[in-house]
């Protein structure tokens, strides 16, 4: 904010709810009074044209009636007003008014009044041009070096320059590569037009080049080509400024050289006539308008710059000389000479605040209003404080973040998985190498207590399981009426899933008194898919690389009671072995001991053990629960197969490292491809044809490399997703074994799941290894710490891909060791010191809780 404000000399408020822009302000001796006193011409988008001649009785006065010389309402919006020698046969000034579809030239004259009401002014239409295209802006000047008259150039919204030689239309030309209109100005010294294109380049076009180019109005291109007439419009010079421009002004004062000023969105440029930068100024604000004017110092130019902070800044070249506060944000600024004062700054705001001001040292003061004082009643304050404390106490009784659900939900969702597989498989686009890919149907029933509109049902299953349809939309739900939806689930990818649990969610909006459109609500349910969806019975295998032994506290159970769908009815009463063949995995064998209470699960792939082991324990629990036995437990005597687990971690991590290499290689080839493109573009733009020197061959080869690397990167991402799914299966198996080994409760198993499975999806920026390592470090530093020194260690707050997996493996091993020595998982703050004291004693037997 400036220390000083612009001193108000004269001001006026124009109309009501009218809008103004950059071209709506002009200052000139439009009535040719001969006194060299300027008048202010203002046009508005509402079609009003006003001419003012300020004569304040004292500085700061508002507009008097006699200050308004003329006010006319035109039929069309006024886009721009200019004053020049626009009428042939005379060199007096006339007023040009640009409308969207019309150009009008008027003569403004005044008649001396004989009475006290003052002089009379009138505006006479000299000629007009109806435009075939919608106009955007115009500029004028002695095009082609003519003497004693000004020609007009209008820029249309579609990029055409229309030239008018006073009363007659001359020709029209299209600017090359046009997209959106930009500021346009004429340079008398070089006889050229300067604009800023949509490519963020300052471009200069010679008038002679435009005059002899192909006629834009003539569509008989074939005839012109036969006659040999017309040339291509080519820019004289181009300068890339890298931003859009707000305005262009071309000045040439006596003591300074010719200069082209360009006001950008963040920079202010001064160019030479050849397009070279004379100087530039980086602005730390958003400018709204500018106006260069003559400086008292030789060789310099002063510039007024208005910004959106209601500031007016004065620069001498690049040096800030003065800053003043304005009452409004200016959209146009000019410098005018009036009868009583010269060098007046005229500003116009978007809402029509016209202000004439000068720079001075009138401070911009802000006085804080006095606060109304009142006597304080401490007894009333105590009563109010107690009431507020009571309200806060009641509000903090519950720690729930989400609001409590009602006893009877507005909407219920029930999912039912059919017991039998589909007679005709619904699998489509499967990648599994199997003759038959089974599918199972899931039926979902939605029932509402209220009338609801636009309820959306979404179904999701873990990859690589897929659905025939995963989204259903119910346009309306009536109270008490059930609606059902059905979809089939099948295995699509050529690898086993990490889970067989799916979920369904219904989202809807419930109208309330405060929000009639409805408050978003959701209802969700989960369903478990059958094991036979991903495997089928086979002959058991006696040997395998990976084996697990599960102990129970109950006598052996006939496996036909646990897996009836996988075992055919046989004459033997006791079945002690079952074989499972995963559709996208290895064979898994389940063996039951006939003499002990042990069961063995074995397979050639470690991660393939997970689904069968999990299903085996769940069916065991259901079997004994149906018989009313509640003290059934399973246990694992160890050791936890960490080496097999570490191999899967290394495979997943190696794919992540390869992904980074592919990204770096793809980035390098892309840079090379763009560099070759630039070289080729330079050769093609050169007016003198030169050999390509095999650049086209190099471009084609680089393009093929980019496509090949991109395809390889996509294939790597698919392999990485498969590896993450296998790692997730192995991780869940390790968590299950640790829970059985240490007899962990549900809360402790939930901590392990949150530690080892923090991500639903793996990625390059945030991957599984660094996330799990950070969580393990926290557990080892808190509840599983051996001493207070470990608790004092600070963890890094930045997660990045590690160099290798040695640190992660070490932390996983430490976790198992410390849990075997009595460490217990807990999220409480004081658990770390207690566990440290326990683990400093005698080691505890791993099989004892």
Swiss-Prot record:
Site features described as Critical for protein stability, chain residue numbers: 141
Main location class: membrane
Region (Seven-bladed beta-propeller): 1-407
Entry's Gene Ontology cellular component terms: BBSome; centriolar satellite; ciliary membrane; cilium; cytoplasm; membrane
Keyword Cytoplasm belongs to the record: yes
Origin: domain of life: Eukaryota
Region (Disordered): 825-849
InterPro entries named among the record's database cross-references: PHTB1_GAE_dom, PHTB1_N_dom, PTHB1, PTHB1_CtH_dom, PTHB1_hp_dom, PTHB1_pf_dom
Compartment annotation: Cell projection, Cilium membrane; Cytoplasm, Cytoskeleton, Microtubule organizing center, Centrosome, Centriolar satellite
Polar residues bias spans: 828-849
GO terms, biological process: cilium assembly
A Pfam family per the record: PTHB1_GAE
Keywords, comma-separated and alphabetical: Cell membrane, Cell projection, Cilium, Cytoplasm, Cytoskeleton, Membrane
Job of this protein: Required for ciliogenesis.
Protein name: Protein PTHB1
